[in-house]
């Protein structure tokens, strides 16, 4: 767009109404299964996700922080399609639905950047090598959560400064 346009261009959306897909299941606030996840619903969701042509999926089901079995079942089915799947019950297992959903969407979006880098690093290294990334808590882990990895750079900087200071003191 021209630099002085009067019509704002907007930002790319991580989530659109068309990409929010329902699945028929229900878990109560106490974690009990009220409406089981049936295979027909699972197959329908797989087909809808495949038609969207996305690279990653965020799964956020009500009360999954108490009982994640439905999220885990959906993840297993969607991972078979070659997609990165972020589960709210793993990313941020708390009762607050908006925060849990937001963090899970960001995790899935971040995966489209971080997972290919991790795969490329592994492909370039000798067989049996591991890639570890510093997460927001300062711990280096392999198979990290993409969202925690994005916030890990500050923690990694502090850890590196601490290590350099320790090396300097040894001299």
Features from the language model and the residues they span:
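N-terminally biased helix-coil "hinge/interface" segments that flank
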Residues: 1-171
């Amino acid at each position: 767009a021209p630099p002085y346009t009067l019509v704002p261009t907007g930002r790319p959306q991580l989530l659109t109404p068309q990409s929010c897909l329902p699945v028929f299941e229900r878990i109560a606030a106490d974690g009990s299964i009220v409406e089981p996840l049936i295979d027909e619903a699972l197959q329908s969701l797989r087909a809808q996700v495949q038609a969207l042509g996305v690279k990653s999926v965020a799964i956020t089901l009500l009360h999954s922080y108490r009982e994640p079995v439905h999220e885990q079942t959906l993840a297993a089915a969607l991972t078979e399609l070659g997609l990165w799947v972020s589960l709210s019950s793993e990313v941020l297992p708390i009762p607050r639905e908006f925060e849990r959903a937001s963090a899970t969407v960001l995790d899935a979006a971040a995966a489209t950047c971080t997972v290919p880098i991790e795969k490329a690093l592994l492909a370039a290294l000798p067989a049996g090598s591991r890639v570890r990334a510093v997460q927001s808590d300062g711990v280096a882990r392999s198979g990290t959560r993409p969202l925690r990895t994005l916030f890990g750079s500050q923690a990694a900087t502090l850890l590196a400064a601490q290590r350099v200071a320790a090396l300097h003191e040894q001299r």
